[in-house]
Design a protein with these regions (language model features):
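NTP-dependent small-molecule kinase module
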Residues: 23, 126-172
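Conserved substrate/cofactor phosphate-moiety recognition/catalytic segment
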Residues: 18-61
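A glycine- and Lys/Arg-enriched "phosphate-lid" helix/loop adjacent to the NTP-binding pocket
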Residues: 88-135
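Walker A (P-loop) ATP-phosphate-binding motif of ABC ATPase nucleotide-binding domains
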Residues: 2
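Conserved lysine of the Walker
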Residues: 13
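Hydrophobic anchor at the beta1->P-loop junction of P-loop NTPases
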Residues: 5
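Glycine-rich phosphate-binding loop used to anchor ATP phosphates in small-molecule kinases
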Residues: 50-95
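The conserved Walker
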Residues: 9
Length: 172
């Protein structure tokens, strides 16, 4: 099984990726961990592309979380069996980001790149509330739904996510 988890910051992409990776006994690739070097420095795009390509070439199943439309995006969407988009309310996402920061302050989450300490600042708050959910990004998700209707799953709130997980829909 090959699964993409796309969506908004703070919606729970990494948590869901770990759950599904465990269920399928599939490797999980957190694209944040590929995109960033220690200290939240962005990796050179060609190197990022090479790392993701190598991952895709060497695994027959996977769970991948993160958007990163410039990193093997078309190939990822084409190869994946399910494309799950988490599009929760902006204020819920912000609350979850704050809660995540509080729980992990001074530490590096396992879904982050080594040396990227959990942080929250005005720029990231702006990203969660506005920049990360632009009309263009939302239109991109709608385009994926049109292009891959048979494997597209939109989850808009925690209740829908709980229903999805309890229904076993992910195991089809």
């Amino acid at each position: 099984m090959k699964i993409a988890i796309l969506g908004l910051s703070g919606s729970g992409k990494s948590t869901l990726a770990k759950q599904l990776g465990s269920f399928y006994h599939a490797p999980v690739l957190h694209l944040d961990a590929v995109h960033f070097l220690p200290g939240w420095v962005e990796r050179v795009p060609g190197e990022e592309e090479q790392l993701v390509t190598s991952f895709l070439d060497t695994h027959s199943s996977w769970v991948m979380d993160g958007n990163y439309t410039k990193t093997c995006y078309a190939r990822r969407l084409e190869e994946e069996d399910q494309i799950i988009v988490l599009a929760f309310n902006r204020f819920l996402c912000l609350w979850r980001v704050i809660r995540r920061w509080w729980a992990n302050r001074g530490a590096v989450r396992d879904s982050s790149a080594p040396g990227c300490m959990e942080k929250i600042d005005a720029e990231f708050v702006w990203w969660v509330l506005y920049q990360g959910r632009t009309p263009a990004r939302m239109a991109g998700y709608r385009q994926i739904a049109r292009q891959y209707p048979e494997k597209f799953i939109l989850i808009q709130n925690p209740r829908q996510l709980a229903r999805f997980l309890s229904s076993g829909s992910y195991s089809q």
